Amino acid sequence: MITSRIDYDTGILYVDFKGEITLEDLLEHVTIQERRSHYPKKLKILTNATTAEFFLQPRDLVAVKEEMSRTLKKYKVIYDAFVVNHTKSTALSVFYMELATLDNYHFKVFSTKEAAENWLKSI
């Protein structure tokens, strides 16, 4: 399950990934971001995926990158801090970080929420 809420004071979109996460879940999550007209054009995302179990293959991340590329047209820039703490989640996240190198999309992997928030607040 993926849930989200935006903190308008900090401009950070807080996202929680919990339980089983599939490719379909990720694509739907990215598509929803495109439809949110009230989000800032400089979007900062903090995703807590520490309790998620990803049912993905590395090749699935190409589809996520393609959907994100389409969504990015709506935003000036997106900063995406992704918090993980399991081996498979970390491996998939680092692979995606290398794959998703786009001019206006910055994705970083963190092991703590505090480090992720510090990065987003420093931008």
Show which residues each predicted segment covers.
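Amphipathic, Lys/Arg-enriched alpha-helical "gate/interface" segment within cytosolic domains
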Residues: 1-123
